[in-house]
């Protein structure tokens, strides 16, 4: 819209349909300034509203709290009682054959597939960032502040990510592994983990 207006006014000037006093006048400069500003405002207002609407999930099926520490992640399933764990990277010397070096963890985040998941992200010490690129998720973890993001997995699988904020010497040793499973498997996993943590 802005380019069209500029090209239209430029073509009028080149065809000399505007008088010489209009070309040098302030009216044209005023139009070139105000009209693009109005167009930008008309584009920005609905965009900002949609941006904030996309950030909110009305009723997620599961809420997960991810807390970044130097240099591991803590997870709390807030919809379950006593379902929390720490997730550390598996050292290369202890890594089973066939697993990814620097990406495998001792406790994966397990979520049910085809369910809206809300992730509340914070940090306990310094800035971190909870990022899983294949899910389109990246949220900064800031001490004393709760940020949120959401995602839905459409297929079972394992999704890898890492802390994407330089947070110290072992920054590259903070992998994130999200495992998407069918609902029945998730329910059995959560009940097994809840019963083992209560012992």
UniProtKB/Swiss-Prot annotation:
Keyword Cell membrane: no
Xref: PROSITE patterns: COX2, COX2_CUA, COX2_TM
Cofactor(s) needed for function: Cu cation
Annotated EC: 7.1.1.9
GO biological process assignments: ATP synthesis coupled electron transport
Membrane topology term: Multi-pass membrane protein
Stretches of the chain found on the membrane's Mitochondrial intermembrane side: 55-199
Ranges of the Mitochondrial matrix topological domain: 14-26
Protein's cellular compartments: Mitochondrion inner membrane
Bilayer-crossing regions: 1-13, 27-54
Cofactor-binding details, from the entry: Binds a dinuclear copper A center per subunit.
Catalyses which reaction(s): 4 Fe(II)-[cytochrome c] + O2 + 8 H(+)(in) = 4 Fe(III)-[cytochrome c] + 2 H2O + 4 H(+)(out)
Residues bound to Mg(2+): 165
Gene Ontology MF, one: cytochrome-c oxidase activity
Residues at which Cu cation A2 binds: 163, 165, 167, 171
Family annotation (InterPro entries): CcO_II, CcO_II-like_C, CcO_II_C, Copper_CuA, Cupredoxin, Cyt_c_oxidase_su2, Cyt_c_oxidase_su2_TM_dom, Cyt_c_oxidase_su2_TM_sf
Keywords carried by this UniProt record: Copper, Electron transport, Magnesium, Membrane, Metal-binding, Mitochondrion, Mitochondrion inner membrane, Respiratory chain, Translocase, Transmembrane, Transmembrane helix, Transport
SUPFAM superfamilies membership: Cupredoxins, Cytochrome c oxidase subunit II-like, transmembrane region
Keyword set includes Magnesium: yes
Cellular component, GO annotation: mitochondrial inner membrane; respiratory chain complex IV
Binding site for Cu cation A1: 128, 163, 167, 174
Cited CDD domains: CcO_II_C
Protein task: Component of the cytochrome c oxidase, the last enzyme in the mitochondrial electron transport chain which drives oxidative phosphorylation. The respiratory chain contains 3 multisubunit complexes succinate dehydrogenase (complex II, CII), ubiquinol-cytochrome c oxidoreductase (cytochrome b-c1 complex, complex III, CIII) and cytochrome c oxidase (complex IV, CIV), that cooperate to transfer electrons derived from NADH and succinate to molecular oxygen, creating an electrochemical gradient over the inner membrane that drives transmembrane transport and the ATP synthase.
Similarity comment text for this entry: Belongs to the cytochrome c oxidase subunit 2 family.
Quaternary structure note: Component of the cytochrome c oxidase (complex IV, CIV), a multisubunit enzyme composed of 14 subunits. The complex is composed of a catalytic core of 3 subunits MT-CO1, MT-CO2 and MT-CO3, encoded in the mitochondrial DNA, and 11 supernumerary subunits COX4I, COX5A, COX5B, COX6A, COX6B, COX6C, COX7A, COX7B, COX7C, COX8 and NDUFA4, which are encoded in the nuclear genome.
Protein's name according to its UniProt entry: Cytochrome c oxidase subunit 2
Organism classification: Eukaryota, Metazoa, Chordata, Craniata, Vertebrata
